[in-house]
Amino acid sequence: MTIDNKKILIPIVWKYVETYEHKRAVQTSIDRYKLRLDSSSNIKEWIEEYEYDPLYELVRQTMLTEKIINSEDDEFPVDDYIHINVIPEGNIELRSEIECYPKGLKDSSKFIVIDPRQLMMPIKDLYRDLYNYLEERYRK
């Protein structure tokens, strides 16, 4: 919760060594998402690049997050979101493939790409065993 009592949904996607084949998504699926994109979305407009992963995956995640926020759920009300993608700095290919995504957003501050070490730094001293486990597990 923020200082002004807003509840923030934080979808986190962890990527390490993923690569994508850049296959175009199925047309019926593309059409479904294009039709649901409206002026309330943080996505400015549909562009052809969104029809290929990894951008297609990011669009779907963003739209799902927005759907949750707009659902006005009484049990789990959410006011806003920050979409976090955890990608090692060494995965240059994936980082370069998604670097255009924030440019297609009305508010690019809602999309963050962060290295796992940087994300885990706040727990390093307090949860040393967890930090060491994650460091070892995802070092490769």
PLM features per residue range, with description:
Residues I12-V13, Y81-E89:
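Extended hydrophobic secondary-structure segments that form protein cores and membrane-embedded regions
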Residues T2-P11, T19, E66:
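Active-site beta-strand-loop-beta-strand hairpin of nuclease catalytic cores
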Residues H22-R24, T65, I92-C100:
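A short acidic (Asp/Glu
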Residues M1-I3, R139-K140:
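Basic, amphipathic N-terminal segments that precede the first structured/catalytic domain
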Residues Y16-T19, E89-I92:
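Short, solvent-exposed loop/turn segments at secondary-structure junctions
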